[in-house]
Structures are given as C-alpha cells and as structure tokens.
Amino acid sequence: MTQTKEERVHQVFESIYKRYDMMNSVISFQRHKAWRKDTMKRMKVQPGDHALDVCCGTADWTIALGEAVGHNGKVEGLDFSKNMLLIGEEKVKEHKMKHVSLRHGNAMELPYADETFDVVTIGFGLRNVPDYMQVLKEMHRVVKKGGKVVCLETSQPTIPVFKNLYFFYFRRVMPVFGKVFAKSYDEYSWLQESTMSFPNREKLAEMFREAGFERVDVKPYSGGVACMHLGVKGKN
C-alpha cells in the first residue's frame, strides 16, 4: 500500500527522534543555530508575548521563544510526533520553563481559537506538511491582527554552480550521513526529497501573500540554502 505524505513524514520523525538534533548539526554544519538566532532578532519578540511554535519537534525554537517572552509570557509548541515531543519535554524541564508547554497535534488543523497568539513560528517543518497553503492559512488564523508569522526553512540557492553542488549534497551525501550517524538512510533520504520539491523563496513569499500576510520579509542564509519568511497579519 502506498503511504501518504503525512504517513511517511510521521514514520520518519517517529524513527529518527533520538538522533534528530545531532543530525541537524551535521547536515547544516552547525549553521541552523545561527540562522535561528538571526531570525529571532528580526522577529523582535517582546517580553510577555504569547507565542506558538508549529511543528516544534524537539523544541529548540520553542525554548528560544520561551527565553524571549520571559516568565510573564507564554509559549506553546505543537507537533504530530509524540517521540519528538518526548525529547522536547525533557529540554523544557531542563530549562525550568513553566511558561512553556508542548502539545500533540496537527499543523493542518491548529487546535486554537482565532487570533490567539502574538507570534507564530514554524522551523524546518513546513516542507513536511501535506498542504503548505493550508498550514499558512491556519497560522494566519490563529495569530492576532498585527502579529507575525515566521517560517525558517531549507531553500534552494540561485547561483548556478553553488546550486548544483547543493543538490548533489542533498541527493548523495546527506542520506549517507543519515546512515552513518543516525542509522537511517531511508529516513534521511526523505529530507532531500522534501527539500527538492519545496517552493523556492520567491514562490513561498507569494504564498505568504496569498494566505493573507502583509509586509512579507525574506532573508536567505548561507547562499540560499535556508531562508526566513516573515509576514504580518493586517489590522483590518
């Protein structure tokens, strides 16, 4: 029986959860932390904000948001992989963040009321959902008017030679890293497949606007291998 995208992604993350953080560092050459740090600066999260981290995984960005909003704020992380959430829960406990909570749920149908959050993030998760636009619209729905929705995701370089090297790395090298470091060749082959089929930064910016966002800001990182998209929900 052929798996749906949702079923395959769920299987992947339920399998690789123990080595997910290590592999993120190996695959991105530790750059993912710098990308997230710069994205956080651009977001200008305020103390006391109420934030949601969609597809939170092992909760690294969730915890960064928790630090930014402070104990007078509130952060919720949501993911459909219970195993990834187990790792995330341990991290939240280690950081003693009582204002941060994690929840099992589906990004396609966010279990929150309209206009609940000041900021909504999704980090390296949008490419894994069955319907990109549906998730963007859901994030638009739950963010407050004037609030921000931010996506940090893999992208494709535009410089021809670099683009060819990048595609070779993702297709040939990264699955081997997955086999060596995480014992998961098949699972990490999914990452290159999902990255190759994901919209480029211009198309994703257009999708943000189609979902209803204004003042869409785009920031590529490391020659375009990753990219931040930030959109604001209009006040009208």
Curated annotation (Swiss-Prot):
PANTHER family: 2-METHOXY-6-POLYPRENYL-1,4-BENZOQUINOL METHYLASE, MITOCHONDRIAL (PTHR43591:SF24), METHYLTRANSFERASE (PTHR43591)
Protein name, UniProt field: Demethylmenaquinone methyltransferase
GO molecular function: demethylmenaquinone methyltransferase activity
Enzyme class: transferase
Chain's role: Methyltransferase required for the conversion of demethylmenaquinol (DMKH2) to menaquinol (MKH2).
EC number from the UniProt entry: 2.1.1.163
Keyword Transferase: yes
Residue positions binding S-adenosyl-L-methionine: T58, D79, N106, A107
Classification via Pfam families: Ubie_methyltran
Superkingdom to which the source organism belongs: Bacteria
Transmembrane segments: none
Record has Ribonucleoprotein as a keyword: no
UniProt entry keywords in alphabetical sequence: Menaquinone biosynthesis, Methyltransferase, S-adenosyl-L-methionine, Transferase
InterPro entries per UniProt: MenG_heptapren (IPR014122), SAM-dependent_MTases_sf (IPR029063), UbiE/COQ5_MeTrFase (IPR004033), UbiE/COQ5_MeTrFase_CS (IPR023576)
